[in-house]
């Protein structure tokens, strides 16, 4: 679990299953400087790693969780240190703080809960000044809209609400009403 403060429900369920749950800060951790980072787990260390190719504040947490998962699966799925370095350098995830080249600057992100919206807000804020920020937004009806809007309202100048073609989705009209 790469969340530094995992939900109690995850910890309890893992204990109920008798799972060997690896937890960030207890079973593995990372550290870094401006040029590289390192990871340490129960019995293995990686030093001098290049930062993941993905942009965003949470990427070392995510990469650390991936390295922990690979370490757990090592007996069934051995992965070389070079393959890990290549993977970190070449990783891409469409729609996760994806910056589309051109003018205007276009950022695509599928942030879908308060935690991921917080990361999106931090990443947008770190990008620097842009005269205006427009957001196209759609969401499922069961999401915590108040928490998501609270994080994004200070950063967005113009909102465009979208209907999503899913039964669980809030309509654009419902989003406008909530906003």
Residue ranges, per PLM feature:
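Nucleotide phosphate-binding/pyrophosphate-handling subdomain across enzymes
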Residues: 40-158
């Amino acid at each position: 679990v790469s969340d530094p403060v995992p939900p109690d429900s995850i910890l309890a369920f893992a204990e109920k299953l008798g799972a060997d749950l690896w937890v960030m800060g207890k079973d593995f951790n990372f550290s870094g400087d401006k040029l590289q980072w390192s990871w340490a787990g129960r019995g293995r260390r990686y030093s001098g790693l290049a930062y993941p190719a993905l942009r965003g504040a949470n990427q070392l947490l995510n990469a650390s969780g991936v390295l922990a998962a690979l370490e757990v699966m090592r007996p069934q799925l051995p992965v070389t240190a070079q393959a890990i370095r290549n993977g970190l350098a070449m990783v891409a995830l469409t729609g996760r703080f994806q910056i589309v080249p051109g003018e205007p600057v276009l950022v695509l992100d599928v942030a879908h809960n308060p935690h991921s919206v917080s990361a999106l807000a931090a990443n947008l804020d770190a990008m620097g000044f842009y005269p205006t920020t427009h957001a196209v937004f759609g969401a499922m009806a069961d999401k915590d809209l108040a928490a998501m809007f609270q994080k994004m309202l200070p950063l967005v100048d113009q909102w465009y609400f979208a209907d999503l073609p899913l039964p669980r989705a809030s309509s654009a009209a419902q989003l406008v009403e909530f906003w």
